Amino acid sequence: RELARDLIGQELGRYNEEQLLAARAPLDLPAEDALAEAVHDALFRLGRLQPLLDDEQLENIDVNGPDEVWLEYADGTVVAGPPIADSNEELVELIRSIGAYAGHAARRFDAGYPMLDLKLPDGHRLAAIMEVSTRPAMSIRRHRFQRVFLAHPHEDNLLDMGVVDYGLAEFLAACVRARKNIVISGETGAGKTTMLRALANAMHPAERLITIENALELGLHEHKDLHRNVIALEARQANVEGEGEIAMATLVQRTLRHNPYRVIVGEVLGDEVVSMLEAMSQGNAGSLCTIHSSSPAFTFRRMAMYAAKSAMRLEPWVTYQMIEGAIDFVVFIHQHIDRGADGARRRVRHVASVLEVLEADGRIVATNEVFQPGPDGRAVPYTPPRCLGDLELEGYDPSLFHNPNGWWAP
């Protein structure tokens, strides 16, 4: 690519010489640099989409057609963005080339398979759709924190971000060390994947991990100083003959043959919930997953809904019994847009509740609310968990539960 930049520079130099010979103004330095970068992006990166991906403050990019782009920043501000293509056909071709070259394996994007999900080279998540929409559309979730911790003096961490306080960070780290199975739930964009990364980074670097995702985005295998022994698995869609599909449920079942110390499911989206619960209850203690949910309690109903739609058609009471034997804690993350005294918008994310799973009957999953929402909605200590002794063995200080207001910064 350095050679390409040199060649682009040479061509622009020749262009400027021709302009001077023709008594026309050459490109000034800023214009020349901008054109060189645009040509490089078009040839080797993602064209007009690339400058948006390079913006560290952007969190979501929604494309409703080639000329309708919406940008959502980390503080929740939404503004219109520049066009990224000149026509529907050009946008489809851009997405198709991304599917062919940018992911872990080539993925189709055509009339026969008009939906695409994949991880971009820089770790961001892309979802695209065509044919069933009036115009081709695309959404990109930028993962601003690829390497993140619960608490860390020198790296990105949830404590500094205000997602957890000191007491929560200590509690969750102890849960990970004690190999408790944890489900992270919350609405879209709440920061579930970021929390999952932070919890995973509290594990010992030598532990063997297997991650399963619909589209690779966790990236734990890319940080060898944090995770030395990782297999990253990605679901695969069928080929043009309709063959070769490998579903997430199949991959979760397969993990049991590969000696995992922990199994991590990036996002539970369907019938893989049954395989995941089986894996968690069959010796893979300390496993993690995320799931969409509007409340802590609805997390269990969401799992029951997925299991009911699976090939096994499980009754809710059966799923609840599986949850009792598989899940130790549910960490629920809440998000909202806050307006400061100056009127500026700010997206706020924080843990609102931590549930400990106790038992289940035919109707409900009984839980113990270990951390409950305080007056401002942020989680504060409420009821010590039944497994407190296990956490103490891993270095947790039980006196941290004696502060009913938590350690949140004002």
Model-assigned labels for residue ranges:
Residues 72-178:
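P-loop NTP-binding catalytic core
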Residues 192:
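Conserved lysine of the Walker
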Residues 341-410:
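NTP-binding/hydrolysis catalytic cores, primarily Walker-type P-loop NTPases
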Residues 1-109, 117:
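N-terminal accessory targeting/assembly segments
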Residues 189:
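Walker A (P-loop) phosphate-binding loop of P-loop NTPases
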Residues 61, 128, 263, 284, ...:
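Residue-level signature of catalytic and energy-coupling elements of molecular machines
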Residues 179-182, 198-324, 334:
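Switch/coupling sub-region of P-loop NTPases
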Residues 186:
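The Walker A (P-loop) glycine that initiates the GxxxxGKT/S ATP-binding motif of P-loop NTPases
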